[in-house]
Amino acid sequence: MVKVYAPASSANMSVGFDVLGAAVTPVDGSLLGDVVSVDAAESFTLNNLGRFADKLPSAPRENIVYQCWERFCQELGKQIPVAMTLEKNMPIGSGLGSSACSVVAALVAMNEFCGKPLNDTRLLAIMGELEGRISGSIHYDNVAPCFLGGMQLMIEENGIISQQVPGFDEWLWVLAYPGINVSTAEARAILPAQYRRQDCIAHGRHLAGFIHACYSRQPQLAAKLMKDVIAEPYRARLLPGFSQARQAVAEIGALASGISGSGPTLFALCDKPDTAQRVADWLGKNYLQNQEGFVHICQLDTAGARVLG
């Protein structure tokens, strides 16, 4: 049997719409992500477990893990009889790369089980394709960091899909999921078809400056440049209490904050553990809307998807 864990990820990071993403892991050592197991069987079966299993489609063929198995078999040109188990620990429509977790864990598990017939680049391409079935367009800003770990910049040139950007060890990512769902497709539909020239210029300046600050090891400058003129001005209206929360965490001492992925999760970046804890406490009391919500203090997950057993 092969068991694979795929971590949560925070896409866009305010400054890099559709081209930046970071894999994250709680500092307390708990797992924030999905687990997929693959075992030999006479015919294909899929079993769903975990805290959010009841949110998955009831029809097996609509389950993204089934679609991963089907696409993997197509790639190899043969049917592979296996028993798959999805441990769905990530809330759907959370802005934490929930579908990417399932896609990455399923495809890595299948590849490991079959003796690694596909290389990382081919696997990542298929991951983006399957993620696109859910979000409505192929993009890699969740699957790439989830699979490869760390902070990833999407390249998509010369056969390179993404490359790692150096992060900062002192950065702590406070992630607050309020317990409501926002579909990626809905969050994309709310965006304008065209942008003003000055917004495009600002976006390019922020992103280029952020990447430069990461490579030149200027954490304060990097955090200052984490600004979103592309998505947040439009998506904020989908998130109750978001604007107030951003103001509050800034007053507490967060270096930057924004929407994780397409929301509703809010991320706040801190460089001191006590600040991160105070931010987490405030968000836990004021941003969460029901019992399904949670707050985690995280750091970059540099390992990405990994075999557990």
Swiss-Prot record:
Q: Which GO terms describe its cellular component?
A: cytoplasm
Q: In which pathway does it act?
A: Amino-acid biosynthesis; L-threonine biosynthesis; L-threonine from L-aspartate: step 4/5
Q: Quote the catalytic activity from the record.
A: L-homoserine + ATP = O-phospho-L-homoserine + ADP + H(+)
The Gene Ontology biological process terms listed for this entry are: threonine biosynthetic process
According to its UniProt record, where is this protein located? Cytoplasm
Entry's Pfam families? GHMP_kinases_C, GHMP_kinases_N
The EC code for this enzyme is: 2.7.1.39
- Alphabetical UniProt keywords: Amino-acid biosynthesis, ATP-binding, Cytoplasm, Kinase, Nucleotide-binding, Threonine biosynthesis, Transferase
Q: Where does ATP bind?
A: P91, I92, G93, S94, G95, L96, G97, S98, S99, A100, C101
Q: Name one GO molecular function term.
A: ATP binding
- Major place of localization? cytoplasm
* InterPro entries documented for this protein: GHMP_kinase_C_dom, GHMP_kinase_C_sf, GHMP_kinase_N_dom, GHMP_knse_ATP-bd_CS, Homoserine_kinase, Ribosomal_Su5_D2-typ_SF, Ribsml_uS5_D2-typ_fold_subgr
**Transmembrane stretches, start-end:** none
Query: Which PROSITE patterns has this protein been placed in?
Result: GHMP_KINASES_ATP
Give the signal peptide, or none.
none
Family as reported in the entry's similarity comment? Belongs to the GHMP kinase family. Homoserine kinase subfamily.
Physiological role: Catalyzes the ATP-dependent phosphorylation of L-homoserine to L-homoserine phosphate.
Listed NCBIfam families? PRK01212.1-4, thrB
Name of this chain's protein: Homoserine kinase
Q: What is the lineage of its organism?
A: Bacteria, Pseudomonadati, Pseudomonadota, Gammaproteobacteria, Enterobacterales
The gene designation is: thrB
